[in-house]
Regions:
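Short beta-strands and strand-coil junctions in structured, solvent-facing domains, enriched
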Residues: 1, 33-34
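A generic structural-conservation signal
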Residues: 35, 77, 146-147
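Long, low-complexity, intrinsically disordered segments
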Residues: 170-178
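ABC-family ATPase nucleotide-binding domain "signature/switch" substructure
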Residues: 4-11, 20, 25-31, 41-140
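C-terminal boundary and immediately downstream tail of ABC-type ATPase nucleotide-binding domains
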Residues: 139-171
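Conserved hydrophobic/aromatic "anchor" residues
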Residues: 1-2, 42, 144, 148
């Protein structure tokens, strides 16, 4: 985030956005209630890189800005890497509808970010070593399956991995309500 108000940070996504559009984007990004709690609301000045906001709040303001921008291609680089579990859930809930209908490239160590990707690429030491859907990669029993086991079944959701970076690309398609 830039050293300016939350409003101006959001308007970088769409300079001519109306107050109603700002509200809709903030609600979609799960940050509206927090902004409303601030003494100056959208006119609250945030410091360089958003020092007055938590990591999750900064991410959600950035997501609201992207919602306003409405890009055809979305690139997420470690979107939930430094967040606690609660903030991660809020950010992921905001990302799901944002990713629908557009190409999304997500770079992540936390596999929860990419489970529903159409295609997952696993990189190790600078090379793509696996490619497939979540189910396919689990069946193969390679690096991805080991990371999944470590992060989910082993209860180490915040595990730091040394095997490589996981990248996912594709559109997220909602298959039910929720």
């Amino acid at each position: 985030l830039f050293h300016t108000t939350i409003r101006r940070n959001l308007l970088y996504g769409k300079p001519d956005a109306t107050d109603e559009e700002l509200d809709a984007a903030a609600r979609a990004a799960n940050i509206y209630d927090r902004i409303a709690e601030l003494p100056d609301g959208y006119d609250t000045v945030v410091g360089e890189r958003g020092y007055k906001l938590s990591g999750g709040e900064k991410q959600r303001v950035a997501i609201a800005r992207v919602i306003l921008k409405d890009p055809r291609i979305l690139i997420l680089d470690e979107a939930t890497s430094s967040l606690d579990t609660t903030s991660e859930r809020l950010v992921q809930a905001a990302l799901v509808p944002l990713m629908e209908g557009r190409t999304t490239i997500a770079i992540a160590h936390r596999l929860s970010t990419i489970l529903s990707a159409d295609v997952i690429f696993v990189a190790d030491r600078g090379r793509i070593v696996e490619r497939g859907t979540h189910a396919e990669l689990l069946r193969r029993g390679g690096i991805y399956a080991r990371l999944y086991e470590q992060q989910f079944r082993g209860g180490l959701v915040e595990a730091v991995t040394e095997d490589g970076v996981i990248m996912a690309t594709g559109e997220v398609v909602r298959t039910g309500s929720g």
